[in-house]
Amino acid sequence: MLMPRKVKHRKQHHPSRTGMAKGGTSVAFGDYGIQALEPAYVTNRQIESARIAMTRHIRRGGKIWINIYPDRPLTKKPAETRMGSGKGSPEWWVANVKPGRVMFEMSYPNEETAREALRRAMHKLPMKCRIVTREEQF
């Protein structure tokens, strides 16, 4: 799973999910990409699940780039715990994704197969997305 090796602070404030993405809004490495249309927290498990869905569909050939990284810890308090007594322990790692961000990129010779692989990966993500190419941008 993706997660930082070492962090300065174990617990962080929740990042803002409002506004549009400032960078990473165009396809830079591959020919096709998945672009977010809504803000969301994407967990390390969701990123890994989308990556596996893409690689299993394209088999050999092609290349995949992951442009987001889960560097934010989200905390959770145990079940049946009274209010107060501090913040909960870190439970999972998330990437803060804003609308317009290209999260995954892919280069593959056959466009139809590449679009199907990206469509399968989009089903694993917690927000609305769309497939973009190098020519068309947000």
Swiss-Prot record:
Q: Name one GO biological process term.
A: translation
Record field: compositional bias (Basic residues): 1-16
The record lists the lineage as: Bacteria, Bacillati, Actinomycetota, Actinomycetes, Mycobacteriales
Q: What is this protein called?
A: Large ribosomal subunit protein uL16
Give a GO molecular function annotation for the protein. structural constituent of ribosome
* Name of the gene encoding the protein in the UniProt record: rplP
Cellular component terms per the entry's GO annotation: cytosolic large ribosomal subunit
Can you name the source organism?
Nocardia farcinica (strain IFM 10152)
Role this protein plays? Binds 23S rRNA and is also seen to make contacts with the A and possibly P site tRNAs.
Region annotated Disordered, chain positions: 1-24
Pfam family for this entry, one: Ribosomal_L16
Q: How does it assemble?
A: Part of the 50S ribosomal subunit.
Give the signal peptide as a residue range, or say none if absent. none
Q: Which UniProt keywords apply?
A: Ribonucleoprotein, Ribosomal protein, RNA-binding, rRNA-binding, tRNA-binding
- What family does the database annotate? Belongs to the universal ribosomal protein uL16 family.
Cite the InterPro entries for this sequence: Ribosomal_uL16 (IPR047873), Ribosomal_uL16_bact-type (IPR000114), Ribosomal_uL16_CS (IPR020798), Ribosomal_uL16_dom (IPR016180), Ribosomal_uL16_sf (IPR036920)
